[in-house]
Amino acid sequence: MKLTPGKLAGLKKVSNDRGVIAAAAMDQRGSLQKALAKEKGSAVSDAMMEEFKSLVTEVLTPHASAILLDPEWGLPASKRRSKNAGLLLAYEKTGYDKTGPGRLPDLLDNWSVRRLKEAGADCIKILLYYTPFDGKEINDKKHAWVERLGDECRANDIPFFLEFVGYEEGVDEKGFDFAKKKPEVVIESMREFTKDRYGVDVMKVEVPVNMKFVEGAKSYAGQKAYTKKEAMDLFRKAASVATKPFIYLSAGVSNAEFSESLELAAEAGVKFNGVLCGRATWKEGIPVYAKQGAEAFRKWLQSEGVKNINNVNDRLKAASSWHSIYEVEPAMVGA
C-alpha cells in the first residue's frame, strides 16, 4: 500500500523519526468540562477550557510527536505546541446522540475537513462508538458515515484517524461481564474498519482486554476474566486482523495501567504503531487546575505530567514503524 503525497506528509508530521506515533490527546470536551466543574464547584468558562488545553499542549508537546485537539476550545492551544509536534484535529461533536439507540455520531456543524486543514490540521480524527453486536440497521448507518468521512479525507488528501470505542447499553463497561466481551468487540471492530472501502489510514484502538481482570497483572483487581497467556493471545489476535497501522488509546485508565497494557502488547510481540494518550497523562492534574489555578497546574504538568508522558514514551521503544506498512523507503522519510 502506498500513500498519496498529502497523506504521507501528514502522517510524517505526527510521527517521530522512527515512524512511531507518540501523540498526546487533549480533545476531551464534555467530560473535561464536567470534571473541572465538579472539582471547582461552579461552572467552567470557555476561557478556562482554552487555558487548560493550552497549558497541557505547551508543557507536554516537547515530549510528544503530535497533539490531538478539538476546534471548539483547542485552536489557541494549537498555536502553543512545540515545533516538533504535529497537529490532529477532531471532527466529531463531543458525546453521541442520546435521542435514540446506537450512540449515533455527529459532526461539528461549522467544520469540514477542508476547514480543519485550513486551521492547521495535519491529520483528521473521528471518534465512533461501535460494537459489532448492534443490529444491522444501526451499524449500516455507521458504516456509511465512516465511508463518507473517508472520501472527504481522500478528497482533501489528508490522513484519516478513526478511533472506535466499544460499548454495550445497560452494562457496566468497566465491569467483569463487559471485560469478557471486550476482546470480540475490539477484534471485530478492527476487522471491519481496516477494510479499504473506509479510507482509514490509522486505527486508534482500545487494548483488547481490561487489565484489571488479567490474572497476575499489576493492575489485577481480584476477579479473573483472562489469564496472562490468554490476554497476550488476544493482543496478538487483534493485531492479526489489522491491515492498516494501529495505535492504542488510553481510555481514561491510570498511567500505570496504560503503561502495563503497552508492556503486555510488547511481550506478546504485537507490532503496534504508537499511542494517542490523553487522560492517562494529565487527568490527575484536573483538581490542581480547578482549585489552585493555572500556575499550580503548569508546575504539576512540568513534574507529574512530563513524568507520565515519559513513562508511556519508554514503552514505545517496543512500537513498530508504520513506514513498512505504507512502503515508505528510508530515503523518503526525511524528504
What are these regions (language model features)?
Residues 1-136, 199, 223-227, 244-245, ...:
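Alpha/beta catalytic barrel-like cores
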Residues 2, 134-143, 175-187, 250-260:
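Active-site glycine- and acidic-residue-rich loops that bind
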Residues 24, 163, 203, 278:
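Conserved, mostly hydrophobic/aromatic
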Residues 33, 170-175, 201-220, 280-292, ...:
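Flexible glycine/acidic-rich beta-alpha junction loops that bind and position SAM and/or redox cofactors
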Residues 73-78, 132-154, 161, 212-219, ...:
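Active-site-adjacent beta->alpha loops and helix N-cap segments on the catalytic face
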Residues 120, 176-205, 265-276:
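Structural recognition of alpha->loop->beta junctions
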Residues 202-207, 245-254, 274-276:
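Glycine-rich anion-binding loop/nest that anchors nucleotide
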